[in-house]
Regions:
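N-terminal targeting signals for Sec/Tat export/insertion, comprising classic cleavable signal peptides
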Residues: 29-58, 68
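Short, solvent-exposed loop/turn positions at domain surfaces
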Residues: 48, 54-56, 73, 118, ...
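Elongated, acidic membrane-bridging lipid-handling scaffolds
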Residues: 135-137
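Hydrophobic h-region of N-terminal signal peptides that target proteins for export
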Residues: 10-17
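C-terminal interaction modules
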Residues: 2-7, 19-25, 44-49, 63, ...
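A structural signal for short, hydrophobic beta-strand segments that form beta-sheets
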Residues: 23-32, 87
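Short, small-residue-rich packing micro-motifs
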Residues: 35, 60-131, 159-168
Length: 257
């Protein structure tokens, strides 16, 4: 009898273990919005507002505006005017987070309130460079010309580090890593990256990081639950659509017999 009880207890732990290993999608939400900011999902575009929740593969972009996005529990991404990003990955597995952002155009400021857990990775990629970190403050610029001049339109293509360390690679050769320390920069195009000391006019722009702060933990948990609820609803809708498609197929097969 004791052996039977032990078997039941052990087998009861198996589903829990699998549940812990199942990847979940991190929260990404708008902290502040000023002016024209939008997001695109499934081919549809809508204005971004404070507390707008974003999902993996969403494209977030600004025109004459700015937006601050919290990604996961400790990262804030500030998009300058005329900036476009894709949230390519927002995954958490076994308490390790994997965040990937694609900067299609414009300038993005990234700040971490604390280091990510060991084994985690935050990578932001422009058309020419990839910057990977676990906890720091830095700017990545695609260096493209903005539709209209603004306070950050003079930031050239490159990576500019305020605090911490950033590993930078050419987009076409991600195995070639150049490490940047605080106060350093890499500029140029893909095949001619130049490492140096950050220019004075760029150092002044680093003051923006003082304004970037994550939401309080209690608020984060509330919004995280809301995102999980929305994900569950989306899955139900998708499953319902699949069932309807299956019914239609079966109906056609039956009618053709």
């Amino acid at each position: 009898m004791p052996k039977i009880v032990l078997l039941v207890l052990v087998s009861g732990l198996i589903p829990l273990t699998y549940a812990q290993q199942k990847p979940k999608e991190l929260l990404a939400a708008a902290l502040s919005v000023s002016g024209e900011a939008f997001f695109e999902r499934d081919g549809k575009t809508a204005p971004a507002k404070i507390k707008t929740i974003f999902f993996k593969s969403d494209r977030v972009f600004t025109k004459k505006g700015k937006i601050d996005i919290q990604i996961g529990p400790s990262a804030v991404l500030h998009l300058a005017p005329y900036t476009s990003v894709k949230l390519a990955d927002l995954t958490e597995v076994d308490k390790k987070t994997h965040i990937a952002v694609e900067l299609d155009s414009g300038r993005g400021y990234t700040k971490f309130s604390k280091q990510m857990p060991a084994g985690s990775k935050y990578a932001i990629k422009s058309p020419t460079m990839v910057a990977a970190v676990r906890g720091t403050e830095f700017v990545l610029s695609a260096g493209d010309e903005s539709a209209e001049p603004h306070e950050d339109s003079d930031i050239p293509a490159g990576v500019f580090v305020n605090t911490g360390k950033v590993a930078v690679s050419p987009a076409s050769r991600e195995d070639e890593v150049i490490e940047l320390a605080p106060g350093e920069q890499i500029t140029g195009v893909d095949n001619t990256l130049v490492k140096g000391v950050m220019e004075d006019f760029l150092k002044k722009k680093m003051k923006l990081f003082k304004q970037l702060n994550c939401m309080k933990e209690a608020q984060y948990k509330i919004m995280e639950r809301e995102k999980n609820r929305q994900i569950e609803l989306l899955e139900k809708v998708r499953n319902s659509s699949k069932m309807e498609e299956l019914r239609e197929k079966n109906k056609k097969l039956f009618n053709n017999q």
